[in-house]
């Protein structure tokens, strides 16, 4: 019989002095919670302090995903349903994320004093270089909604070399005209600030339906302790300048762009017009059926798939698993061969290209997808 030998087994991760297995598990859980919550920073800029939260660690030769939220929201209420969606984890594990809160919109923000001059949207865009310098990040992929989409677009116009791509949801690149101002003033006489902001965020059909989502966000805005700050951000949005996009001109976005809007959303016409002004070789247009005014809240799965395609076209996520939009495309191409036009809008795909396929490389044409 072979002689038994004593074998000493040591832990792969030895416990700290005085640490029990139970406390080690608690420490590991606390670390995971901290990682999930991100790290919040504030930086001073020429236009005041701005707060942002960083998730993950920088990846070599990869840009940061950089988000900016809409009026009435902060980064959590605007983007958490999207970035916590299951299929999105494949993306976020490959990129560091920076979520910006507009001044005074972060959780626990004090109310600005009476007479405080809130930054314009152009000035909010001018804060972004201070954030990137603080983090030592050189390039970003921007994801913005509403006012945030405008801010990121303004930044991209001023600093094109630092923006690799933009996902712009509900962007309105135009300044308010006289008719818009008159309607806004008239609405202000009969509606509260929360009601006006809700009308900006959601369609009338959604507001009339009063779903759980609408009830949730109505409560968030109506009972916000920083409602005065929200009104200042709202006023800055309504005083925005025209971005003056011009197809074929000097004033245009130089990076790949994905425009996103919900079918019958409040900003559908504005996004369609924006699409007509951008470079068709760099722009894709995603119109999402049954998503309402905030597709990142109501259809995070479809938007995640579109985002994966967008990143793949930029040379990232090449081996990513595409599912929902792939099935939608297959059904659409089958539908296109049929005379029957009664098929659901959620299964249609139309492109200005005659290839009949989604681009696998950088965007080469304007495409419109209803999914």
From Swiss-Prot:
Residue ranges of the region described as Disordered: 1-22, 334-371
Classification via InterPro entries: AB_hydrolase_fold, NDRG
Residues modified as Phosphothreonine: 20, 330, 334, 348, 357
Domain of life per record: Eukaryota
Annotated SUPFAM superfamilies: alpha/beta-Hydrolases
Location(s) in or outside the cell: Cytoplasm; Cytoplasm, Perinuclear region; Cell projection, Growth cone
Residue ranges that the Swiss-Prot or TrEMBL entry lists as coiled coil: none
Signal peptide residue numbers: none
Keyword Acetylation assigned: yes
Sorted UniProt keywords: Acetylation, Cell projection, Cytoplasm, Developmental protein, Differentiation, Neurogenesis, Phosphoprotein, Tumor suppressor, Wnt signaling pathway
Principal subcellular localization: cytoplasm
Pfam families: Ndr (PF03096)
PANTHER family, per database record: N-MYC DOWNSTREAM REGULATED (PTHR11034)
Record family assignment: Belongs to the NDRG family.
Protein name: Protein NDRG2
Organism from which the protein derives: Mus musculus
